[in-house]
Amino acid sequence: MAKKEFKAESKRLLDMMINSIYTQKEIFLRELISNSSDAIDKIYYKALTDDALTFDKDSYYIKVAADKDARTLTISDTGIGMTKDELEQHLGTIAKSGSLAFKKENELKDGHDIIGQFGVGFYAAFMVADVVTVISKALGSEEAYKWESAGADGYTIEPCEKDSVGTDIILKIKENTEDDSYDEFLEEYRLKAIIKKYSDFIRYPIKMDTTINKPKEGSENEFEEVQEEQTVNSMVPIWRKNKSELTDEDYEKFYAEKHYGFDKPLTHVHISVDGAVRYNAILFVPENMPFDYYSKEYEKGLELYSNGVLIMNKCADLLPDHFSFVKGMVDSEDLSLNISREMLQHDRQLKLIAKNISKKIKSELQSLLKKDREKYETFYKSFGRQLKFGVYNDFGANKDQLKDLLLFYSSKEKKLVSLDEYVSRMPEEQKFIYYATGDSYDRIEKLPQTEMVADKGYEILYFTEDIDEFAIKMLASYQEKEFKSVSSGDLGIDTDEDQKQSEEEESKYKDLFEEMKNILSDKVKNVRISKRLKSHPVCLAADGEVTIEMEKILNAMPDSQNVKAEKVLEINPNHEVFQTLQDAFEQDKEKLSLYTNLLYNQALLIEGLPIQDPVEFTNNICKVMV
């Protein structure tokens, strides 16, 4: 029997198929099972137009069987089979897709769609097999044929015996090498795991002889191992079921089965779209933050299926970074896949799906915020920081999408409030949305800078996370109300009369403040009368865009550039200390220097900033005491 050469394109092309197109050897089983599913689909299509042919789904299946002794793995199907000419055309010509040709000839939908389109998946078998044998009997044919190949040097075709219509693919599994173990593809547990991973939702049963323990006949305590044929795959994916048929428990079970998390999902979104791009999706918002969420090891992304076949474990392009906590899957018939079906081409369909998914996630979170505040706050405590990063990142490109999802602790409500809730209860005369920053709510409560704003009866938002102020700076305003730090130079509270009084006081004490500024040198930009202090003697404010809290955060980062806020030392003219400063200015410049440095260091401590010279500070305290 003469060996025939592959028609297309030689040894180099087949080597590329085996060694370059696929990144994981286990993919071979997915490809062969998908081909078997296509073969059964073809009978279904023919039955739609051929009255003499009936299609009883229960009669069709795929069988996977391993023989460790013979070192073979067999994938059988009860599909349409192939004639000698079809074996020649589809297996003798690399990259010739029989499924694609069949689809073009049979433009029928009816809920079915054939998976194969490239004609290269079959050759993935050579990644794990030295010899591949195909025994096939076509529907309506009396003859069966055997196709066999050991790789790029060619193949043979000869008549053979086969009782039933369908195809058997027999792989002679390679021997182990130093780098690769091929034994795993003969192990029952491994084969089942690969089937569950990639082909769990193939619409036909995938059967295997499975080892189970059963009580020995006539004995209650003794067990024996027996082989029992079982269906490995689930077949009907949950996402193709009608939402009205499913319960929360069904979604929770799916979440657990897919190992999306150890917790229960906080909420889920079930999407079915049959428009320009057809797809189904189930998305989950976890209750708890994964332990590695803010580490380099965490991978965002959704599982991506094409016609129920897993293509990617983590398709990052389907989720924006600010929704990277979302788990779940997408299944579509309309995606443009690369030749190995392992990767997506970056196309319009993918972008449309990703855009719609992002809208659905936001809509679900907004609904949760309005209808189940307790559940939303549970979510926010885990993932609110990520939403704030989303506002700040990409130069604020997503800030308008995310701003209504933000929550901050309120000085009045003593709980988390939304920006909309804050603005809705602002007094008419209030011009700004006020905020204060600090390490904790308790610490912010005690900040001297909050006194004036609180005295006016205005609500203050408390920022305790390092991203908070950066996000708000990017947001800039909400419902035409600008954000204003209680530590900013101008609080926007003064009346014309207040402003006039301040200018008079600044002029009156100008010489004192200039002397204090000279004492502190470049530590501060200015020294001035405080319009915000009521009971405290001193505080630091910041002029310019960089606030004192931002200075702390930026300088704590690796490779920091020693960022400095433009600090201003503010003195309360109504505090007893101020008279002491005036007396020292007029009578004892050395004491003025001592008091000025003490007050400056006191202001640093209030802000949580380090004192440059702690020894000098403690010595100065001792000098005052004696």
UniProtKB/Swiss-Prot annotation:
SUPFAM superfamilies: ATPase domain of HSP90 chaperone/DNA topoisomerase II/histidine kinase (SSF55874), HSP90 C-terminal domain (SSF110942), Ribosomal protein S5 domain 2-like (SSF54211)
Primary location recorded for the protein, binned into one broad class: cytoplasm
Region described as A: spans on this chain: 1-341
UniProt GO molecular function: ATP binding; ATP hydrolysis activity; ATP-dependent protein folding chaperone; unfolded protein binding
Keywords: ATP-binding, Chaperone, Cytoplasm, Nucleotide-binding, Stress response
Gene3D superfamilies: 3.30.230.80, 3.40.50.11260, Heat shock protein 90, C-terminal domain (1.20.120.790), Histidine kinase-like ATPase, C-terminal domain (3.30.565.10)
Keyword Nucleotide-binding carried by entry: yes
Region of interest called B, as start-end residue ranges on this chain: 342-552
GO biological process: DNA damage response; protein folding; response to heat
Known function: Molecular chaperone. Has ATPase activity.
Listed name of the protein: Chaperone protein HtpG
Organism in which the protein naturally occurs: Bacillus subtilis (strain 168)
